[in-house]
């Protein structure tokens, strides 16, 4: 029904009179939904929009006693102007890929608890990735994934997946879908293209990386020729399948290029790598500039990610030598030395107005993207391949078993888990505050006791939970 801006959707009345802007429409929608004692997810196409919607929503002060311990933990460890904190103080959860995993989990738990008062969730597509919620209402901000030059229209499958988040988790018989972008309904009502897989379609042109995973009957002549070339290159170098088949996101040809680059290094450069590995395995792990630069030069030609490639290309002049080094070294060394907060503080100082909430949120997104995307995913996969090829080269050169060759495994483990011991890695995978991971990685019991004694109320609760899992 529609009479002068008044609309009824599934028994709920909304008044959009003189509310043409999205901000005003979302305010009206959420106000009415909350008055009806319901909850809602606002799907946003970007992290920035998810944060903006949370910031713009005006809500009366909320009694946060239910999650005071969690809120106190956030205030103790993060800037109070961070939108995740500001939003929670008014009962709104912000959920996207740049929010630390343990905070994402806690926000979903609060949203699913009626007594918490967290009744609104602003989110990107992370809400469709294995997350169950009690949402009654789904509001679509924009019918896209991403924004700017990286933005893509939602497919019918995506749209139905988003819409399907409303009325789930055995909580509601039906859900309510409301969209602020009419294109969303065009997409969701479309039959959509049949979902196909390039590995099972002879008519789809494949990249070299797809060839290995495509059944024989779906390969064209070009793919077959490439596979023969790769097999010949592999056999000429004697690289076993079990080594070349790891890190499937990088093509075998690129792995062989990395192997060839390692084999072509001079004795001086091999000595630098050896020194780099020795420093990694010292009691206090450290990055050695010259060896790390050799590794970056080895992998550079196969790196496809624009951000990582730029960080390798751009260099700085060393104060203590005539050499130039990749800024990736400086950034990674800073992270390993000072952690998330150290990188965040550096990024915040570079913002135009460091005291503003917009600067805080921008610095948090940049820091999270650098650590979680560039370091822990992009860099890990390339130096992971370097590690495979380097250890194989050393095992052949020195005629020792592959397992006895020393590589950069310590750095890979540190980047992937930020932890070394098995218990610490389990905790990291589960998603816990860093202090709990540090507890399990403690070099001795005295240090473990010191860290445990510094746990705040929230960390104590999570520690008990993960400790029960580890000690089962």
Regions found by a protein language model. Name each.
Residues 59, 63-82:
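Charged, low-complexity hinge/linker segments at coiled-coil and domain boundaries
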Residues 220-472:
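C-terminal accessory/interaction regions of large nucleic acid-associated machines
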Residues 1-56, 93:
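Conserved interdomain linker/interface between the two RecA-like ATPase lobes of SF2 helicase motors
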Residues 104-108, 121-138, 164-174:
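SF2 helicase motor core recognition
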Residues 186-239:
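Long, hydrophobic alpha-helical segments
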Residues 47-51, 104, 152-160:
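Amphipathic alpha-helical transducer elements in NTP-driven molecular machines
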Residues 77-124, 172:
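Conserved helicase ATPase core of P-loop NTP-dependent helicases/translocases
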Residues 133, 141-146, 152-196:
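Conserved segment of the helicase C-terminal RecA-like domain
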């Amino acid at each position: 029904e529609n009479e002068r801006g008044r609309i009824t959707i599934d028994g709920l009345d909304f008044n959009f009179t003189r509310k043409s802007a999205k901000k005003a429409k979302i305010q009206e929608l959420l106000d009415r939904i909350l008055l009806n004692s319901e909850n809602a997810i606002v799907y946003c196409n970007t992290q920035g929009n998810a944060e903006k919607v949370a910031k713009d929503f005006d809500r009366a002060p909320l009694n946060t006693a239910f999650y005071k311990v969690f809120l106190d933990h956030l205030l103790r460890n993060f800037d109070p102007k961070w939108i995740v904190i500001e939003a929670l103080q008014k009962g709104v959860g912000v959920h996207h890929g740049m929010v630390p995993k343990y905070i994402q989990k806690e926000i979903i738990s609060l949203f699913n608890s009626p007594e918490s008062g967290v009744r609104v969730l602003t989110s990107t597509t992370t809400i469709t990735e294995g997350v169950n919620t009690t949402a009654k209402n789904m509001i679509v901000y924009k019918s896209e994934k991403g924004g700017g030059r990286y933005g893509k229209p939602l497919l019918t499958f995506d749209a139905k997946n988003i819409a399907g988040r409303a009325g789930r988790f055995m909580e509601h018989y039906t859900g309510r879908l409301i969209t602020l972008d009419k294109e969303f309904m065009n997409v969701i009502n479309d039959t959509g293209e049949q979902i196909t897989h390039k590995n099972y379609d002879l008519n789809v042109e494949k990249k070299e990386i797809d060839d290995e995973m495509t059944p024989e009957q779906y390969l064209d002549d070009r793919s077959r020729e490439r596979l023969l070339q790769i097999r010949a290159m592999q056999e000429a170098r004697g690289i076993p399948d079990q080594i070349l088949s790891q890190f499937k996101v990088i093509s075998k040809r690129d792995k062989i290029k990395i192997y060839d680059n390692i084999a072509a290094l001079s004795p001086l450069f091999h000595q630098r790598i050896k020194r780099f590995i020795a420093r990694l395995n010292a009691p206090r792990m450290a990055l050695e500039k010259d060896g790390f630069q050799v590794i970056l030069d080895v992998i550079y030609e196969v790196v496809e990610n624009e951000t990582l490639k730029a960080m390798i290309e751009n260099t700085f002049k060393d104060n203590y030598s005539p050499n130039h080094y990749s800024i990736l070294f400086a950034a990674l060394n800073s992270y390993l030395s000072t952690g998330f907060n150290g990188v965040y503080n550096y990024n915040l100082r570079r913002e135009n107005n460091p005291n503003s909430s917009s600067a805080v949120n921008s610095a948090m997104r940049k820091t999270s993207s650098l650590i979680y995307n560039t370091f822990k995913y992009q860099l890990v996969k390339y130096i992971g391949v370097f590690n495979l090829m380097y250890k194989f080269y050393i095992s052949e050169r020195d005629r020792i078993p592959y397992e006895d060759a020393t590589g950069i495994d310590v750095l890979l483990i540190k980047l992937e888990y930020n932890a070394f011991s098995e218990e610490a890695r389990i905790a990291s995978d589960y998603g816990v505050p860093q202090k709990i991971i540090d507890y399990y990685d403690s070099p001795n019991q005295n240090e473990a006791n010191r860290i445990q004694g510094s746990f705040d109320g929230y960390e104590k609760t999570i520690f008990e939970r993960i400790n029960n899992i580890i000690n089962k």
